[in-house]
Amino acid sequence: MTAAAAATAPNEVTEMATETTALSPRFYTTDVKAMNELSVEAVRAEWDKLMAEFAADKNFGHFKRTDDWAFDPNDLPEDLRKELTDFMVSSLTAEFSGCVLYAELHKKGFDPDMKTLFKFLARDESRHAGFINECLRDFGVQVDMGFLVREKKYTHFSPKFILYATYLSEKIGYARYIRIYRHLEQNPDHQFHPIFQKFFRWCNDEFRHGEALALILRANPKLLRGHNRMWIRFFQLAVFTTMYVRDHTRPAFHRALGIDPEEYGMDVFRITAEISKQVFPDILDVDNPKFLAGLRKIHELALRIDASKKKGFFGKLRAIPLQLGVGVRFLKLLFLPTQANALPEEIRVAPAW
């Protein structure tokens, strides 16, 4: 590598954020015109009230390091330090993915309601990503977000897929953060990084984002009918499965928090499923014993795939039937009985967890 190339090469955490894998957060594009053709008139009163909440910007100034901020990464064992960095980079990438998508929808949109919403969402996600990047400074690194915008691969989704995926992402983000926050309220000795102190107000941003996306979906009921019901089921399962497998790659992180990743995951799934009753006509039955059994099997196969891929060309060949096995297990989970849900007249729910 030449000196000039070395000077412009991304650092390690930027490379981590740029990677596209089955478990890593992705960057998305969509059909801006089709998104702006959706209407919120059917939920106008609730929409205007929610936009006023966004405009009030109650979390302005929250995402800053306070005077009592105290953290030294050298105080952590190496495995925990590595997994905390991975958690932060993954979280930053997910937040920044939303920022990039929402900013594009605001910039290129033409419907006033959509432009207003996506301006607020991009504002919040930018703050979240920027704050995590500030936290990474303690490790002597930061993600080059400009490089990320240019170099990370983008996945194109139709507007309805964007709405299903981002709604679930925002709501499961709320559930993840509030579950950790409530746990640390009761177990403060496990709070090994000050970022967790921010999670209560942070997760309410995520919840509010999900409320806006729920209103769009409910205002356009065709997105919740017919074959779309199977897509909704698919996205629920994809989000839950990805979280379950990814969280099990951070044993030291969860051990330091005093949280069992499986128990934590199931709690998060239950919260997310309960919230999702505001908008989805079919809810995954996460308490069906076959659901957890299927997740465990997919995790087991994922471990075997990872081990095989590290053994060169023939290892990658041996991974192929294992990958097919993951697909089979996923399909079995997809066709488990779901809970039929009559959509409530009052759409919005309160972040009461």
Please report, for each region that a protein language model flagged, where it lies by residue.
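Non-heme di-metal
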Residues: 2-353
